[in-house]
Amino acid sequence: MADAAPADVKKLSFERAMEELETIVKRLEDGKVPLEESVAIYERGEALKRRCEELLRQAEARVDKITTDAQGQPVGTEPLDVQ
């Protein structure tokens, strides 16, 4: 991460949040980050993880499954049960 202020997590797209999260994981796994910075980027990583989970739940809620009649012909859609 550069010296620029990090983007607001709540405004990030799924792809951007995942990209940043992957960068944070790599930096933490490297073990070369000072303790104070490690704590700060870990906290940001947690926020990014929550954002990704939120966006995935929203996407799942929008997914429809196709319903078919007895002959297998599509007749409509209904919400996908993602439990």
UniProtKB/Swiss-Prot annotation:
UniProt-listed Enzyme Commission number(s): 3.1.11.6
Superkingdom, natural source: Bacteria
HAMAP family named among the record's database cross-references: Exonuc_7_S
Xref: Pfam families: Exonuc_VII_S
Catalytic activity field: Exonucleolytic cleavage in either 5'- to 3'- or 3'- to 5'-direction to yield nucleoside 5'-phosphates
Gene3D superfamilies (alphabetical): Exonuclease VII, small subunit
Its job: Bidirectionally degrades single-stranded DNA into large acid-insoluble oligonucleotides, which are then degraded further into small acid-soluble oligonucleotides.
Gene Ontology biological process terms in this record: DNA catabolic process
Gene Ontology, cellular component aspect: cytosol; exodeoxyribonuclease VII complex
Broad EC category: hydrolase
Keyword hit for Acetylation: no
UniProt xrefs under InterPro entries: Exonuc_VII_S (IPR003761), Exonuc_VII_ssu_sf (IPR037004)
Record keyword Nuclease present: yes
Predominant cellular place of this UniProt entry's protein: cytoplasm
Keywords: Cytoplasm, Exonuclease, Hydrolase, Nuclease
Compartments, record wording: Cytoplasm
Recorded GO MF terms: exodeoxyribonuclease VII activity
The protein's assembly and partners: Heterooligomer composed of large and small subunits.
Name of the featured protein: Exodeoxyribonuclease 7 small subunit
Assigned protein family: Belongs to the XseB family.
